From Swiss-Prot:
Lineage, uppermost ranks: Viruses, Duplodnaviria, Heunggongvirae, Peploviricota, Herviviricetes
Residues covered by region (Disordered): 72-114
Name of the protein this chain belongs to: Uncharacterized gene 2 protein
Composition bias, Low complexity: 101-110
Bias (Polar residues) ranges: 90-100
Origin species: Equine herpesvirus 1 (strain Ab4p)
Classification via Pfam families: DUF5435
Domain of life (superkingdom): Viruses
Length: 205
């Protein structure tokens, strides 16, 4: 038997000694990517994974994603913490040593005392200049914007936070707009058919 043929037979067995595996042919994609032009073009049109939205909508205010650098966790007792675990550890240690009072005093921003719980979520404040907001009843500071998931007394007096509007247009508006466009397109097709039919009628006469 031909030794080359014998090698082909035993190439599927990895324990065979002195076996020369068949060289794999380079794919067309790798050949194209080896060229500098195609490599640059593939990088240009490659979809970015985990892309952030272009704008973040809260109520009627749009924020660029570059302005949000993470939640600034400010404790109701005056100190800042980098994480939730650190804040919980400091609060629990202070509570065990009887340093903290049982009922913290209410602040000016929270007259009802709903956000004074030691284990409640502290507000994440995004400091911006000249931010216009549409408040109901009370006017908030222009440099404080409260995000979703935290107490915001200026948003709703009942304590319930409204949903964040992430879409520029609603679904009903998009459906109506699409229906109007379809109707206009059908009218244009009918007008075009009438013009063509009239032109053929004149030529036949």
């Amino acid at each position: 038997m031909d030794p080359a043929w014998r090698r082909r037979i035993h190439v599927s067995n990895p324990t065979t000694i002195n076996v020369e595996p068949r060289p794999r042919r380079e794919s067309l994609r790798r050949q194209l990517l080896s060229q500098l032009f195609f490599k640059k073009m593939s990088q240009l049109f490659k979809k970015k994974r985990q892309t952030r939205p272009s704008t973040v909508w809260y109520g009627r205010v749009a924020f660029p994603p570059s302005a949000w650098q993470g939640p600034a966790r400010v404790s109701p007792y005056g100190y800042e913490s980098d994480s939730e675990n650190e804040e919980y550890t400091r609060i629990s240690s202070a509570t065990s040593s009887n340093v903290l009072t049982d009922s913290p005093t209410t602040t000016q921003d929270d007259p009802t005392g709903r956000c004074t719980d030691a284990y409640a979520e502290s507000p994440a404040v995004l400091h911006l200049d000249d931010v216009t907001r549409n408040h109901r009843g009370a006017a908030a500071l222009p440099s404080e914007v409260y995000l979703d998931g935290f107490c915001d007394q200026h948003k709703d007096p009942s304590g319930r936070m409204g949903p964040i509007k992430r879409r520029l247009y609603s679904k009903t508006f998009c459906r109506k707009f699409a229906a109007i466009n379809i109707i206009l397109l059908m009218l244009q097709i009918l007008v075009l058919i009438g013009i063509v039919y009239r032109g053929f009628g004149k030529e036949c006469m």
